[in-house]
Curated annotation (Swiss-Prot):
PANTHER family: LIPID II:GLYCINE GLYCYLTRANSFERASE (PTHR36174:SF1). Belongs to the FemABX family. Catalyzes the incorporation of the first glycine of the pentaglycine interpeptide bridge, which is characteristic of the S.aureus peptidoglycan. This glycine is added to the epsilon-amino group of the L-lysine of the membrane-bound lipid II intermediate (GlcNAc-(beta-1,4)-N-acetylmuramic acid(-L-Ala-D-iGln-L-Lys-D-Ala-D-Ala)-pyrophosphoryl-undecaprenol), using glycyl-tRNA(Gly) as donor, in a ribosome-independent mechanism. Involved in methicillin resistance. GO terms for molecular function: aminoacyltransferase activity. PROSITE patterns: FEMABX. This is Lipid II:glycine glycyltransferase. It comes from the Bacteria. One of its GO terms (biological process) is response to antibiotic. It is found in: Cytoplasm. It catalyses: beta-D-GlcNAc-(1->4)-Mur2Ac(oyl-L-Ala-D-isoglutaminyl-L-Lys-D-Ala-D-Ala)-di-trans,octa-cis-undecaprenyl diphosphate + glycyl-tRNA(Gly) = beta-D-GlcNAc-(1->4)-Mur2Ac(oyl-L-Ala-D-isoglutaminyl-L-Lys-(N(6)-Gly)-D-Ala-D-Ala)-di-trans,octa-cis-undecaprenyl diphosphate + tRNA(Gly) + H(+). The gene is femX. Gene3D superfamilies: 1.20.58.90, 3.40.630.30. Its EC number is 2.3.2.16.
């Protein structure tokens, strides 16, 4: 086994074709990390000119100290049963890490627990310290240890039928409601950033500046690994649909009124059907007024939701999503998710990753809503083997990874107590 010098294109081709490859190991992903102070180095090992393992090493300086952290996000990309290749990757990583004055090498492979026996054993044998099997969204991990994944290597009907029953109904309803899903361009990021700001204010989280999303799009779109989708509501088109539905409902009422006159047996059923139709008419009249007001203010329509869809070979990722507070009954997110899954499948993906979650959290958990949303899309829980540290400077590692977090927690507790007084 020997070190190899390969191009960025060869690195990415290996990552995209390997079962343990991941979006975060693509060379263009490293470009997106520069804004936050990370810089990258890459290594590859193989035999007789054939690549057998690669890794993208991200480095970040420790504040006020002449040291760095090395983070190999979702790496190494290698067959973890191949001890020789794994050892060669670690040797190459250590060589670069020492030159960068790194106190620890941190990895979190894209290897699931039920397939990770070799990885666990061989990494520990090499001296890696396992961070344990904590909840998926534990703050002790950089990346979520658990994600929710939908298999999408099936036809449209099979895909739809893989969703939970109630969610299937919502998707079908969303398809009828009259929104349009667009694959947008870079200009659409302005709209997406505005929707993200609305989402953050509604759900209580800090949002990224538009430059963050532009950075991701610019780095990965050219290779087809980043796409922006937006969902639009056209008022004129939907007013016509509402008018058609109102005509149908009035015709239905007339039909049941006629039956009431000719058949006493059907009178009760007819009255129930009439009442139901009248309720629908009232709702449609309200919707029509809202759409007419929208047409006056925005005759070209408005965008209701958006998302960034990412790729790494046969894997696709729902990376960021945002939505408006308006016309939520149109279920734009359901239309968008189903459309993005089909797009991902048509472009070579077999899986659609919804991102991090905990495993079946309690209803009072802050993560319950996230899990509840992701579980209805025909997903399975992808539980990774977790995070590992290879320590190069034990005193500094002890200070940064263990002592400092405890001091931070202590400060927070003291601050809370003082606020209560």
């Amino acid at each position: 086994m020997e070190k190899m010098h390969i191009t960025n294109q060869e690195h990415d081709a290996f990552v995209k074709s390997h079962p343990n490859g991941d979006l975060l190991q693509l060379t263009k992903w490293a470009e997106t990390k520069k804004l936050t102070g990370w810089y990258a180095r890459r290594i590859a090992v193989g035999r007789d000119g054939e690549v057998q393992g690669v890794a993208q090493l991200l480095f970040k300086k420790v504040p006020k100290l002449p040291y760095t952290l090395c983070y190999i996000s979702r790496g190494f990309v290698v067959d973890y049963s191949n001890k020789e290749a794994l050892n060669a990757l670690l040797d190459s990583a250590k060589e670069i890490a020492k030159a960068e004055k790194t106190y620890a090498i941190k990895i979190d492979p894209d290897v699931e627990v039920d397939k990770g026996t070799d990885a666990l054993q061989n990494l520990k044998a090499l001296g890696f310290k396992h961070k344990g099997f904590k909840e998926g969204l534990s703050k002790d991990y950089i990346q979520p240890r658990m994600t929710m994944i939908t298999p999408i290597d099936k036809n449209d009907d099979e895909l739809l039928n893989s969703f939970e029953r109630r969610n299937r109904s919502k998707v079908r309803l969303a398809l009828k409601r009259g929104t349009t899903v667009e694959r947008s361009d870079r200009e659409g990021l302005k709209t997406f950033a505005e929707l993200m700001k609305i989402t953050g204010e509604r759900d209580g989280f800090l949002t990224r500046d538009i430059s963050y999303f532009e950075n991701i799009y610019d780095a990965l779109h050219e290779d087809g690994d980043a796409e922006l989708f937006l969902v639009k509501l056209d008022p004129k088109e939907n007013i016509a649909k509402v008018n058609q539905e109102l005509n149908e409902l009035h015709a239905e009422i007339a039909k049941w009124q006629q039956k009431m006159k000719t058949s006493e047996k059907q009178a009760k059923k007819a009255q129930n059907m009439i009442n139901d139709a009248q309720n629908k008419i009232a709702k449609n009249e309200d919707l029509k007024r809202d759409l007419e007001a929208l047409e006056k203010e925005h005759p070209e329509g408005i965008y209701l939701s958006g998302a960034l869809l990412m790729f790494a070979g046969s894997k696709s990722y729902y990376l960021y999503g945002a939505s408006s507070n308006e016309f939520r009954d149109f279920l734009p997110n359901h239309h968008m998710q189903y459309t993005m899954m089909k797009y991902a499948r048509e472009h070579g993906a077999t899986t659609y990753d919804f991102g991090g979650t905990d495993n079946d959290p309690d209803k009072d958990s802050e993560h319950y809503g996230l899990w509840a949303f992701k579980k209805v899309w025909g997903t399975y829980l992808s539980e990774k083997i977790g995070e590992f540290d290879y320590v190069l400077n034990q005193p500094l590692y002890q200070l940064i990874e263990q002592v400092k977090p405890r001091l931070t927690k202590a400060k927070i507790k003291i601050s809370r107590k003082l606020k209560r007084k």
